[in-house]
């Protein structure tokens, strides 16, 4: 199974959550990247405020580490309301969700991370709450049990998921605002790195920020994590300032190459190239070849490699592209 402390993994690790929180933008105007999403949100939020209504329910989906939680916080700030946060696996019983819903005030945001992992029982309770702002509660047990309806104040449910396809159709259909987050480009990531460095009181030049951004796999969470490790290197081995050369040396030492790949990415690509002659290779065979679970390959390793054009996913299996061969100084056979 893939190591939990893999430096360039997009999932939270260590002190990420605490540190990310300190670096998060609070308003849309402070938020970098995702231009289409930001433009849409500005319109939806302003319209809801003009009508003095709760914002429509929102589903934010995309790979981990791109800012889904940050956007939920920004929505609450822009609307001037409170936000209550939880996650799908935490809501084990209907009563867990009912306790949250009954404590919401008008217009508040309820943020559910990993919403695709809601249990069916909890999801059933959510339907009338989302549609009619009503909560159906069973009182008593057995033949004496009866259902009562509680009115809820209008609220906004913001669901976040890395696997939108895993949501049930009835739940997905109840979100009026679906927003997909994409991997960030180097320019936007450089801006994020520079801003984070300012928050940390770290001297960094534009080339140093760009070098970190290039190796951050299009993901702000990874960029901030790499920035912290480069800072360590700069303070111990240099004068504390981050330049391109300092960033290069630090990230090379950490085994994060110019494309943002670590040994697991290279292991996956070389398995396709060397063991399966470039592919196509099925997911199960590939998982066995590198000793990983198929879900890890699909959810953690593949998305960035596909998005960057190093792997093609075809009906017959995975294929290493010409770009993958060039990365290792090889020529793809005809």
Swiss-Prot record:
Family: Belongs to the RuvB family.
Region feature (Head domain (RuvB-H)): 258-334
Protein name: Holliday junction branch migration complex subunit RuvB
Catalytic activity: ATP + H2O = ADP + phosphate + H(+)
GO cellular component assignments: cytoplasm; Holliday junction resolvase complex
Residue ranges, annotated region (Small ATPAse domain (RuvB-S)): 185-255
InterPro entries: AAA+_ATPase, AAA_lid_4, DNA_helicase_Holl-junc_RuvB, P-loop_NTPase, RuvB-like_N, RuvB_C, WH-like_DNA-bd_sf, WH_DNA-bd_sf
EC number, as in UniProt: 3.6.4.-
Main location: cytoplasm
HAMAP family: DNA_HJ_migration_RuvB
Lineage: Bacteria, Pseudomonadati, Pseudomonadota, Gammaproteobacteria, Alteromonadales
This protein's encoding gene: ruvB
Positions annotated to bind Mg(2+): 69
Keyword Ribosomal protein assigned: no
